[in-house]
Amino acid sequence: RNNRVCFHNIKYMKNFLLSIVIFLLSSFKSLGHVDHYANFNYLEYELFRNDKLIGYHKYDFKRSGQDLSVVSEVSFNIRKLGVDLYKYFAKSEENYTKGVFQSYSSKTKQNKKNKYVNINIDQNNNNLIIDGSSYKGTTSNKFIVGTWWNHEIVKAKAQISGISGRIIEQTVTFIGKEEVKIGNKTYKTLHFNFKSSDNSLPESKKLNTDIWYEEETYLWVKAAFDKTGYWENRIKKGN
């Protein structure tokens, strides 16, 4: 009987490992471009802090021939007793040609502090040229701007802050497949955790965010992180 149990456990582990390999191959075979977002025109998310609605995050997908521009707007306001404690507003534009990244620009206002970043391609070596409020210089074109709508970010060794241009080295862990219910709709999702690879960073600078993508479409469904409160982005509508 013990031999049968042992054999069953070994067979189970082999099947489990095989399923993980199949998942990785099927999930990431198309990660090179953003062509699989061809059917998306508009995405809108509600932003919650401690389960209280405080703002929104919107994406407009604008196409012209082989060019795609993704225009984003984020706004939220934390208030207490009728007083504004924290106000945030950001606008950005991300540009692609034939599904390949070309440029990114954003302006952000955090209370009275202004931040910005402009990212372009170096035509000599295809590296990224960053001009931001936190970083100015060049970096690898394998790094990706930290706009969560694009699931390519799961395979990047580092992301670039879409607010200030800061380069954030990351470790991405696949947590598992999960069903996520938002409103009256249930999504079959792939759950990932993103953490800063550099443990020497101060806590305020460390990345530790959970992201859920719809399994079939790679639609960004939800984000969550815990920093001065529990924050969530939940999808509201998309077409």
Label the predicted regions.
Residues 19, 30-31:
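Cleavable N-terminal signal peptides
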Residues 128-143:
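Acidic/charged, solvent-exposed loop-and-adjacent secondary-structure segments enriched in E/D, K/R, S/T
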Residues 16-25:
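Sec-dependent N-terminal signal peptides
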Residues 140-154:
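Beta-strand/loop-rich accessory regions of lumenal/periplasmic or secreted enzymes
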Residues 31-123, 152-239:
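Acidic, serine/threonine-rich low-complexity disordered tracts
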Residues 9-17:
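Bacterial N-terminal signal peptides that target proteins for export
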